[in-house]
Swiss-Prot record:
Record bears the keyword Cell membrane: yes
Compartment list: Cell membrane
Domain of life: Bacteria
The name this protein goes by in its record: Putative membrane protein insertion efficiency factor
UniProt-listed InterPro entries: Membr_insert_effic_factor_YidD
SMART domains xrefs: Haemolytic
Annotated function: Could be involved in insertion of integral membrane proteins into the membrane.
One annotated Gene Ontology cellular component of this protein: plasma membrane
Main subcellular location: membrane
Amino acid sequence: MNKLLIGLVNVYKKFISPVLPPTCRYYPTCSTYMIDALKKHGAILGLIMGISRIIRCNPFIKGGVDPVPDYFTLRRNPHPERYEDEIIAQAFHSNKK
């Protein structure tokens, strides 16, 4: 189930997202957040967290850095600074070329 959900999000990222204007107010983007939540918390809790994040991502909020926390929550990550090194490492030291 988890692989199926991640696959669906990847299809969205590859084929649908490039056609739409960028609107996500968070880093990482909502689709990346969904994948990270699915990997970290499994299909059910990860899906719930990802949907909660998509609902939070709207024009009436400030946005900002909001990585997936290590525990289940439907709220914004209260301590994104704890994940700052991990985010920087992923963004700048990726093995992808």
